[in-house]
Amino acid sequence: MQDADTQTTIFGNTVAELVGENLRIGIVQARFNAALTDRLAQACLVELELLGVSAKHIEHVSVPGALEIPIALQAMARRKDFDALIALGCIIRGETYHFELVSNESGAGVTRVSLDHATPIANAILTVENEDQAWARVDDKGRDAARVAVEMVNLMEELS
């Protein structure tokens, strides 16, 4: 049993200490809703640094929108240069069916890349009803994405 000083809490659950040292992380950020995704990325990058991930081990690229995230993740995963990947985007409901299409397809694409390449991907593509909901979530979800990526790498190492 670990003592409380070596544990952290994610999503209300206590987990082993997250160790990001020497990890290589790839980040794909959608530029659509750029003010929001920039803030999401900023929170994610700060948290990765706090977890011990070196800035020189982070590759951060941008794509036009959420639907382009999976193919960029796939290109990164194929290179096998990364321990984990992070998807950052923000989809805000509009008046048409497009919200469901973009939300469902981008989410499914992220999952498929993760499974096809056995690479942990933290999915922080926000799907919200309005801009206020997005602003209320960007900092927490950016930090969570960093933590999820590091936790999943640590777990995958334990399981292999």
UniProtKB/Swiss-Prot annotation:
Reaction catalysis annotation: (2S)-2-hydroxy-3-oxobutyl phosphate + 5-amino-6-(D-ribitylamino)uracil = 6,7-dimethyl-8-(1-D-ribityl)lumazine + phosphate + 2 H2O + H(+)
GO cellular component: cytosol; riboflavin synthase complex
Pathway in which this enzyme or protein is active: Cofactor biosynthesis; riboflavin biosynthesis; riboflavin from 2-hydroxy-3-oxobutyl phosphate and 5-amino-6-(D-ribitylamino)uracil: step 1/2
Protein's GO biological process: riboflavin biosynthetic process
Sequence positions that bind 5-amino-6-(D-ribitylamino)uracil: F32, A66, L67, E68, C90, I91, I92, N123
Keyword annotations: Riboflavin biosynthesis, Transferase
GO molecular function: 6,7-dimethyl-8-ribityllumazine synthase activity
Active site: H98
EC number(s) on file: 2.5.1.78
Domain of life: Bacteria
Listed InterPro entries: LS (IPR034964), LS/RS (IPR002180), LS/RS_sf (IPR036467)
Binding residues annotated for (2S)-2-hydroxy-3-oxobutyl phosphate, in chain numbering: E95, T96, R137
Similarity-based family: Belongs to the DMRL synthase family.
Function: Catalyzes the formation of 6,7-dimethyl-8-ribityllumazine by condensation of 5-amino-6-(D-ribitylamino)uracil with 3,4-dihydroxy-2-butanone 4-phosphate. This is the penultimate step in the biosynthesis of riboflavin.
Matches recorded under HAMAP family: Lumazine_synth (MF_00178)
UniProt-listed PANTHER family: 6,7-DIMETHYL-8-RIBITYLLUMAZINE SYNTHASE, 6,7-DIMETHYL-8-RIBITYLLUMAZINE SYNTHASE DMRL SYNTHASE LUMAZINE SYNTHASE
NCBIfam families: lumazine-synth
Protein name: 6,7-dimethyl-8-ribityllumazine synthase
Organism: Methylibium petroleiphilum (strain ATCC BAA-1232 / LMG 22953 / PM1)
